[in-house]
Amino acid sequence: MFFAFLITYLLGGVTFLPFILFIYLLTRPTHKSEELRIIEPNNDCLTKLDKDIRIQGWIRVTTKFLQGKSGSVKVQEIPQDQLPKSSSDNAVTDRKTISPSGINNQYVIRNPKDVYYATVQAGKLHLFDPVKTSELLHVINLHEYLVVFYPGTVTENELFSNRNAIFLKYPAVSHKKESSTKSLLNKDLYVYGRTPSNKEDWNYALLSYSKISPAIKPLEAPIDFDYASVHHNLTALSSPDTDWLNAFIGRIFLGIHKTEGFKSLVVEKLTKKLSRIKTPGIMTDVKVIDVDVGEAIPTVNGLKFESLSNGGELIVSADIWYEGDCSFKAETTANIKFGSHFPSKTVPLALVIRLTHVSGKVRLLIKPPPSNRVWYAFYEKPRLHLIVEPMVARKQLTNNYLINFITQKLVELVHETIVMPNMNDLAFFIDNEAPIKGGLWDIELFRAPTIQKPAEKDAKAERKKSGLSSSTSEESLNRHISKRSSNSNDTAPSSHIIADKNLEPTSNIQLKKNPDGNLVETSELSDSDENSVLSNKSSTLSKKVVENTSPLKYTHSASKSFIGEVQDSLQALKTKAHKPRSIGGDSSQTTLSETTKKYGSVAKKSFFQGVSDAKSFVKKIKSTYIDDSSSNSPSDIESNYSADDNEISKSKAQNAIDFNVTNTHSPSRSISSEKSYKAAERGQQDKHNDVLVDLNPNVEAEKSNPHSNSQKTSKNDMSRNQRNKYAKEIMTGQPTLHPQGQLPIQNVEQRATHKPLPRPPVQVETREPVRPVPPIPKL
């Protein structure tokens, strides 16, 4: 009995302790899952890639920068039973996924222009077809490109905006002509991602294999990451209570929420967000003019540490709750036009937006180094309560349709900006000493090459090599060229070189500086005509200026050939100047027409001929009509003839006025009628001149004239006024019949053949009077 008890006691004592230890080990809490949760990366946020592939996904690659446009790639997961038809706006890809609820989805690309499915592998960028993702189109070697951001003036907080691009600069692109094909090789490329956060991943992947970053390798951070110390700090924060965090945020907000600097920061952020809204052409840019952040602060609840990878990627989630009255006022102007008959009017438009409630689950992400920013976004669409108050010309509008439309646009803007997968970023540190933007870099290991520019000392050495200093004047340069020309066995001095012996004026070729600072050759000619021609054709000769990268690399052979070209141009201009100019652009009228010359010569001759004829006519009238026994003195006769001349000039002037008035009232008179009238008048004048030359006061011929028998009065009985009247009629070329029916002072032959030419009538085209349009009766 005792022996049995001893055995049972020994066996029970031996097994009891191991049994207790086994129960303890079985029931004790373990941290294995937590350790794995911290170390292993989150599979939801990282893409499962092959070992050799650094990154893959859809990107937009263009050869031109999309100025003022968003280049983001819109990719959506749509169930297979709801897929749209493929078109220019939608492209259904062959990539499929399965949602957590078991629904088969397929990727659809919105606006697939210039979109590729790309991978970065072994230092090369492979671009596949966006729909058939296994069809390779282009392969780009990243080692030949420089990876920077475009535009280069963008700030650190706006690097990964959808309107900015990752610029792949090909160094030799300026030396090669762009091909007409769609090939992307040897060209500058602009890369856009799906989201700003996705663009950062592509930037690091492209930068790691680019020409300017040979030291960066995958999963190698430029700054050492102390994982042990970070893990210790995280495990020390084991309390789930977040009151301290809310108190900390509230204290900071209490100190800055009423400062002008904080308001300016909020205004700048809101203005950039509102600038993404497309406005009509009649409206100007939207500006935020006032901000009121209120007194309440957002509270943080349910702060949860999600994961921390061994590469340094941190993910934290939290629930945000805000209840307050935050408002801001935006303003713009609209230029309204009322037609061409009324002036346009500028109407001020204002919009007051008040945020009273927002709540949702937020994700905070810090990517592995060298990332220097915090990415934040809502997991799902947050609950928002907005109050919109539109105002036009200081008058508030109460149209519900307009208010709902504006509210919907603002909610869509929030969803496109800070709802997954779209994330917004905030740089927590900016290193201005870093060679490039977009991260934290080790300057000692990372050296960006700089574009070498020709140093000033190299230019001075080049000038010394040419035998001239930097302060050489124009005269010394001319002497230097003269010296070079004499050394080249040229017989003519360089300052007086004549290329053509037939060219008479000697050209003085000198070097002068133009307004751009370059040296040009000028020719000072002794002939003033050629100077004028040269000044008129300065634009033609300016094209002949020799372009030199350095003003001291000027050779005599180039100057001699250029001087010959200048002389040939001057000779051509000289011969061209002597050619008759074309009139009205008609090649058939290269010279003055014969009609124009004839009219000019007739007008010139008729003036002097008229003076001589008038003098001879006065002498003949004195000898024929005026009796020697007349009581009229020579002075009286001359005064009478001067008075008659005045009357003749007045009559001619009146005829000219009548003719001009007639032409004024008949604007449709043809040019041929004017020419025929002038020809008839000229022929009548010529015939009258012949009559004056043949005038012969023969008394016997006058007596033999049968018409003279019927004359009852003699010539001596004629009054002086009648004789002057007849003389005036003969001078004007329109002789009329004598009161007794005879022609005065004409012989028988002239009286039988001569008939006065009547003045040709002017062809006047009468116009029908314009009849007034009857008014349109009102309906």
Curated annotation (Swiss-Prot):
GO biological process, one term: lipid transport
UniProt keyword annotation of Membrane present: yes
Sites bearing Phosphoserine, chain numbering: 473
UniProt keyword list: Endoplasmic reticulum, Glycoprotein, Lipid transport, Lipid-binding, Membrane, Nucleus, Phosphoprotein, Signal-anchor, Transmembrane, Transmembrane helix, Transport
GO cellular component annotations of the record: cytoplasm; endoplasmic reticulum; endoplasmic reticulum membrane; endoplasmic reticulum-Golgi intermediate compartment membrane; membrane; nuclear membrane; nucleus-vacuole junction
Glycosylation site positions: 233, 489, 536, 640, 660
Residues in the signal sequence: none
Keyword Zinc: no
Chain intervals with Polar residues compositional bias: 484-494, 660-674, 733-750
Compositionally biased spans, kind Basic and acidic residues: 454-465, 675-691
Region (Disordered) location: 454-539, 573-592, 654-779
Role played: During endoplasmic reticulum (ER) stress or when cellular ceramide levels increase, induces contacts between the ER and medial-Golgi complex to facilitate non-vesicular transport of ceramides from the ER to the Golgi complex where they are converted to complex sphingolipids, preventing toxic ceramide accumulation.
Protein name: Nucleus-vacuole junction protein 2
